[in-house]
From Swiss-Prot:
Cellular component terms (Gene Ontology): cytosol
Chain positions recorded as NAD(+) binding sites: Y127, Q185, N208
Co-factor: note: Binds 1 zinc ion per subunit.
Database matches in InterPro entries: Ald_DH/histidinol_DH, Histidinol_DH_CS, Histidinol_DH_monofunct, Hstdl_DH
A Pfam family of this chain: Histidinol_dh
Species of the source: Pasteurella multocida (strain Pm70)
The EC number(s) this enzyme carries: 1.1.1.23
Protein name: Histidinol dehydrogenase
Gene: hisD
């Protein structure tokens, strides 16, 4: 990790130092995704079977996972892991249940009633990546709020062969339909529907560059997605009271995600920075994914700040996905932290807790999007509608205001919609 003293940098250098690794969708990826889209839209299930053989090296008998397959998968999972998943599910349920919208129903003036009503998104699709490490925790993060929100149909896609942990967790969360479909083809299948796959209104879940590009394309064509996606990242604010081993472990927990991940340490203590660098090397030696972590560390940085106030300013400028605060009285900094997907306060709140079981959602905006986007929550699985209802007297009292405004905007039909009613009321 490169170490930089913040106050020695000019504005351009600061901006460059806070930059992320470049994210560019290559022409090859775009062309490949376009070909997959055309194939799925034109050939439906047939394309999905062919693509499973091509990309997943799997010959499928059915795209739909049977209840018997789910039951067999559940039996193969250790009891201890089942209990851990159930504990995490309970915490996630409690946190998201508490996010239910409060009723908004009031008179803005006498006889003018305004409301906000919330309705679930009817049909949602969840995408869970495959690979060597099954992300069954993401099933919890997506399926639990979808159920609490009351989504009518929840389907899940994951590349075959689907890990037992994913099948067990999906079933535990009440997902009734699971498809053995991965990659960009899963996104296009859920967005457009096929003979077997139900069309959905919104798609959730992470994925590789092909999945990300497919989600971008379906968003342009009318299917909603959860949020823009990018490489994983963490920023740690630490002072002289922080444990360098703890700080190093938090940085490495993100660095091991992928070579394009980025980790940032911001501290007002040079000694802590040096101790953390030593601890990183010691811990790297014990990590199975050390090579991946080293690649991420190559474009990661340590910033030496003047004081904690400057640490906060740097963090807000970077706008991290994960923000770990390991300082004395960490909660005292919270009112000044404006841009982060999820914040972890104190020495015993590692980012891993939020990734799995504290109850917060680990689906977070990255790449600086936390300036304008929020962590995934119950609201993402529902939509708000406003309602207004006016009594005759309420209408009369507000009529002149509306007619004056409509006339000023030269929208005569708007004005007449009020004037016609007002005339009939005065005749009664």
């Amino acid at each position: 990790m490169q170490t930089l003293i913040w106050n020695t940098l000019n504005s351009a250098q600061k901006q460059a130092a806070l930059s992320r690794p470049a994210q560019a969708v290559g022409e090859q990826i775009t062309q490949a995704v376009n070909a997959i889209k055309s194939n799925v839209i034109n050939n439906g299930d047939k394309a999905l079977f062919e693509l499973a053989e091509k990309f997943d090296k799997t010959t499928l008998e059915s795209l739909v996972i049977s209840k018997a397959q789910v039951e067999q998968a559940s039996q193969r999972i250790a009891t201890e892991l089942k209990q851990a998943i159930q504990t995490a599910k309970g915490n996630i349920e409690r946190f998201h249940q508490a996010q239910k919208n409060q009723t908004v129903d009031l008179e803005t003036q006498a006889g003018v009633r305004c409301q906000v009503v919330t309705r679930p998104i009817q049909n949602v699709g969840l995408y869970i990546p495959g690979g060597s490490a099954p992300l069954f925790s993401t099933v919890l993060m997506l399926a639990v709020p979808a159920k609490i929100a009351g989504c009518k149909t929840i389907v899940l896609c994951s590349p075959p062969p689907i890990a037992d942990e994913i099948l067990y967790t999906a079933n535990l969360c009440g997902v009734e339909t699971i498809y053995a479909i991965g990659g960009a083809q899963a996104i296009f299948a859920m967005a457009n529907g096929t003979e077997s796959v139900q069309k959905v209104d919104k798609i959730f879940g992470p994925g590789n560059a092909f999945v990300t590009e497919a989600k971008r394309q379906v968003l342009q064509q009318g299917t909603a997605i959860d949020m823009p996606a990018g490489p994983s990242e963490v920023l740690v604010i630490a002072d002289e009271f922080a444990d360098p081993d703890f700080v190093a472990s938090d940085l490495l927990s993100q660095a091991e995600h992928g070579s394009d991940s980025q980790v940032i340490l911001v501290t007002n203590c040079e000694t802590l920075a040096k101790q953390t660098a030593l601890s990183i090397e010691q811990q790297l030696a014990r990590l199975p994914r050390a090579e991946t972590a080293r690649k991420a560390l190559a474009h990661s940085r340590t910033f030496i700040a003047e004081d904690l106030q400057q640490c906060v300013e740097i963090s807000n400028a970077y706008a991290p996905e994960h923000l770990v605060v390991q300082v004395e009285n960490a909660r005292n900094l919270l009112p000044f932290l404006d841009n982060a997907g999820s914040i972890f306060l104190g020495a015993y709140s590692p980012e891993s807790m939020g990734d799995y079981a504290s109850g917060t959602n680990h689906v977070l905006p990255t790449y600086g999007y936390t300036r304008t986007h929020s962590s995934l929550g119950l609201a993402d699985f529902s939509k708000r509608m406003t309602v207004q209802e006016l009594t005759p007297q309420g209408f009369k009292d507000l009529a002149n205001t509306v007619m004056l405004m409509a006339e000023a905007e030269q929208l005569e039909a708007h004005k007449q919609a009020v004037a016609i009613r007002l005339e009939k009321l005065t005749q009664e």
